[in-house]
Amino acid sequence: HTLRNKYNAIEKINRQRNSSIAEYRIIYHFIKKKEKRSKGVGLCRNYHVRAEIKRQASAIHKLLQKRERVLKFEHQFKGYIADRIVGIDAANSELFCRPEVFAQAFARLSSFKIGFTFHVGEDFYDIADGLRAIDEAILFLNLKRGDRLGHCLALGIQPQIYYSEHDYHLAIPYQVLIDDMVWLKMKSMEWNVAIPPRVEKQIMDIFNGASTGQSMSDYYAAMRLRKEDPHRIGDKSVAHKIYNDYHYNPDLRKRGEVVEDFIVYPEYVSFIEAIQHKMRECIERRQFVIECCPSSNVKIGRLKRFDQHPIFTFCSVKNGNNHNLPVTVNTDDL
C-alpha cells in the first residue's frame, strides 16, 4: 500500500505538470539485523532474521513475477508499479548479520533480470574480517559482473593507519577470529601470498586452540557451506558435520561469543596489505562495481578525512596506481 500511495502521488504530479519529469525506480532493501535472544532450542544462527528475509523474498518474488508479465504485455499493464523494480540490496550494520544469511533469498531472486548489490566491508572487527565478508558476499550471493558491492572500506583503507588507531590490539569474538585466521591461511595459499613466520604461528595457535581434531581444509570447506540452508545440512561429510555444529552446538556458539584480544604484529600489517592487493585484483578482474559513499563514511566516523577514502586506491589518476576498479560515487546520507 505504501508503494502504491507513492506511485499515485508521483503520477498526480506528472499529470499536473503534463510530463513524466518525476521519474523513479525501485530497489528493494533487505535490512541486516542483530538476532534477538531466543529461548528456542535447536534454532540455527540468525533464525528469526532468516525467517523474516524468507517472507520478504517470497513477496518480492511474487511481485517480480508480475513484473515479467508487465514487460511481456506492456500495453495491458501500463503504469503498473512492478515495472519500476530494478534491483535488490541488503544494507545496515553487518557485524551480526553476515552474507550467508541472505544466500537463499538472493538465489531465489537471481532468475529475474534485475541488478544486485550488497553493502559489505564497512563494519568489521579487523580488516581481514571485512575482506572475508566481501569474499563471502561474492561467493554466497553468486554475484556477477556488473553487480555492486557497497562501501568495501576494508578493501582499500590503509592498514598501518587502521591498526595504529587501534593501538595494535583488536577485540574480536572468538568465532570471528577463528574464521578470519582460517580464511587468511587458505587465501594466502590460493593467491600465493607468503605468510610471515610469526603470523603463521599466530594463525595456527588460534586454530589449534579451537580445533577438535578436524583439519583446516575441512573447516574451510565447512565455512564455504554456509551459503546452504542450515535446515537442510545433513551429514554427508566431515565439513557438513562441522557446519552443523556451527549452527546447533550450544557450547561452541557460547565459546564463539567470548571476545579475545588479538595482537597485531608489524608483519601482520604488511601481510594484510598483500591480501588487500590480491583481492582488489580479483574484484577488478571480475568487474564488480564498488559503490563509494565518501560523505557517509566521514559523517558517521568510519574515516576522519576525505583524502583517506579508499576510492583513491580503487580508481585513481595518480601515477603508479595499480588498480582501476569500476566505482560509483553516492551519498548514502538519506
Task: Name each model-derived stretch.
Residues A57, H61-Q76, W191-H277, E281, ...:
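Long, low-complexity, polar/charged, intrinsically disordered or flexibly structured peripheral segments
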Residues H1-E100:
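Metal-coordinating catalytic core of metallo-dependent amide/deamination hydrolases
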Residues E23-I27, R84-D89, G115-T117, G146-G150, ...:
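Structural preference for beta-strand elements that scaffold enzyme active sites
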